[in-house]
Amino acid sequence: SQETILTLLAAVGANNVPGLCMSFMNGHVDTIKAYGEIVFKTPLTSDKRLYLLAAKDSHDLPGLFFALQNGHADSIRMFGSLLNKKMLSSEQIKELLKVKHGLFMALQNGHTKAIMAYGDILKILPPHQEYIDELLWIKNPNGTSGLFMAFYNGHTETIRAFCNILKNYSFTTRRLVEMLSATNKDGIPGVFVSVVNRDKETILEYCRIIKENN
């Protein structure tokens, strides 16, 4: 039965973490590729296929979250190539890419290549603003922007990579200002932190980004 197949393919360990999730955590690209190909070749309903590819742990965190958090760019790209097989709807792909806190962690940790890889996967989706807004409007539960954390930690190249993703889409002026302001929970913009820290490189990069978006 499909339920039996689902249980076997999920390969959940003693810690309630699916095997695919562990592969994302550890950056095992070849395993992700092999597993994804098996999932697409196995006769499953779309919701069961979605369940397996999300590979969520016991805290409901998907495998892609851990790849972003840990900076496994090649794993993210491999996942993107699997999603690009045209066997999933845009809505299903969007569900698999809803890893806001993962992108937040990638910005905070300065995982530039991982963010670039995620941006490449987004190109699979139609460029509807509601899709992109939902995936890139990144704040933690207390309201601090992921981009603010990149400023806070001086991750200049990471800021550039994320803003290059924004350039691929047409945002309203108001939304773009909100995103680029990169505020924390108190409304303090990220560039303010760069000024306080005398982070000249990040300030200059931010000025270039603002100029490009005018």
Residue ranges and their predicted role:
Residues L9, L52-L53, L97, E134-L136, ...:
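Ankyrin-repeat inter-repeat connecting loop/turn
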Residues A11-V12, L53-K56, K100, K139, ...:
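Ankyrin-repeat boundary/linker signal
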Residues T4, D30-A34, D74-M78, A114-A117, ...:
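Conserved ankyrin/ankyrin-like repeat signature
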